[in-house]
Amino acid sequence: MGFLRFGRESAPPPTVQSDTIIPFHYWDDDHHTRGLSFDVTFRVDDILDPEKLRCALSRLLELGDWRKLGARIRRNAEGGLEYHVPQCFDDKRPGFAYSTVAYDMNVADHPQASRLAQPHYLDAAGRPAVQDTTYTATPEFRSFIRTPAFPDRLEGWLRSDSPQLGVRIITFLDATLVTVSFLHSLTDMMGLDAVLDAWSAVLRGREDEVKSFVGFAHDPLAGLTESKTEPLQKYVFADTLLLGWTWFWFALRYIVTIELFWQHREEERVIFLPAKHLQQMRSKAMAELTARGAHDSDTPLFVSEGDVLFAWWTRVVLRAEKPDPSRTVNMRNTYCCRSILAELGHIPSATCALVTNAVFATLTFLSVRQVLEEPLGFTAFEIRKSLIQQRNAEQLQALDRIQRKTLDNAHHPALFGNPSMYTVMMSNWVKAKLFQVDFSAAVIRKGMATGKRSNQLGRPSCIQGTGTKGYATRNTGVVIGKDAAGNFWLLYSLRKEIWPAVEQQLLSMSLDDAA
């Protein structure tokens, strides 16, 4: 809950009169996005040409409104954030921070790079695994993976003339690491996907395939509450909005149990789930639904890999954490609303290059007992029904109106449920297709024979997400993506004390598979 924190900021650099000044979009200037920065590292099993990558990204920022990526962040007189976009970029004011270094060794021989997940070893082993990531917070690792002097907190951007994007390219004898760093206020992961697609198109010499940048000055999420039909539909959980003493009680529990006592005792780790395990769980879930006759006229008999993955992980967390069986579980599942924005006519299409934060959440409320005792298919189907019920234009408009009203009037995020609920949150990046990023046009030579790997030339075999958080993130995480072999990669934050219980559950899955 970073919105409860206050601090003094250094004086910002002087305003450059030729800069284009644009107010932040509403959901980009949010306590959550302001308090989180990302370092997304792509491991490519080939040796890439750093100069080709740099030149392609520089060229992209010269194309139309794509120069907004090079904006500087300032605070206006009212306290809101705004972009100062240079008219052009040069050595004094570059469009992005950049650095590169080459090592005459393999990845496995470098003291920092060797600590990253080893995708080919994990894929060959075929077992679920948990990898410690506490090393990513060490000064040695951060100085290795990030561009030097590039900010990692909002205050760093405000007191400097730093661009929003940082790029670090590290080459080895057998692979290349490409790290893209940015403050979450710039975009969500679907927006990052748009940036990577455009960068790749320029790299291939296909500027004609670069989509027009959407939302340079206009906020496509503005006016969502202007419904096509009146009256505006009621949000499905409107009656459970925490206000007054209920919000105060929830906030007090959060501050006392997490912010004051647990924040420094939470740990973030990478979870590797082989393709076969999720396939087996989904097949079993579908069989359970069929046997129970879960199909009804309104909801098709279907659960996706994402539904099953979230249901499984929620069960893993609850088994390790052991909350009271009667307690309510709030499963918060984020979704991209670009298709709905296109349906409402706010953007040209669902696949346009919209670089902003356009995510909302669907909520599924069950008891701890239900998640632990009912078959996995039951929980997955409840998640699916929540998506169908809430992921539509009418519910998005209703939710957006409540969230804005709560933030503007009560000055805290809108929360739904009950004050004693247990929350498990997941953001699924699979649709961002990060494992399909194509840097093949920059390949100098192969680092690994294509016959010995699943990923294609110039595409990542592993993606690691790290960063800096200005608030506690316990029981929060992401599905980084699905690699070329169909394996899933997660990054999740839990209490340090319960990770051994999580690891034991994943070990049991391996033993059951071997039996």
Curated annotation (Swiss-Prot):
Superkingdom, natural source: Eukaryota
Q: Name the residues annotated as catalytic in the UniProt entry.
A: H184, D438
Enzyme class, top EC level, equals transferase
The protein's UniProt keywords, in alphabetical order, are: Acyltransferase, Transferase
- Extract the GO molecular function terms from the UniProt entry: acyltransferase activity
Please give the record's induction comment.
Expression is positively regulated by the sphingofungins biosynthesis cluster-specific transcription factor sphG.
State which pathway it belongs to: Secondary metabolite biosynthesis
Do the record's keywords include RNA-binding? no
* Disrupted gene: phenotype observed: Leads to an increased accumulation of sphingofungin B.
Which interval of the chain is the signal sequence? none
* Reaction it catalyzes: sphingofungin B + acetyl-CoA = sphingofungin C + CoA
Q: What is its EC number?
A: 2.3.1.-
- Sequence similarity: Belongs to the plant acyltransferase family.
On subunit structure and binding partners, the annotation says: Monomer.
The entry's function note states: Acetyltransferase; part of the gene cluster that mediates the biosynthesis of sphingofungins, bioactive molecules acting as sphingolipid inhibitors via inhibiting serine palmitoyl transferase (SPT). SphE can also convert sphingofungin B1 into sphingofungin C1 and sphingofungin B2 into sphingofungin C2.
Mind telling me what this protein is named? Answer: Acetyltransferase sphE
Organism the protein comes from = Aspergillus fumigatus (strain CBS 144.89 / FGSC A1163 / CEA10)
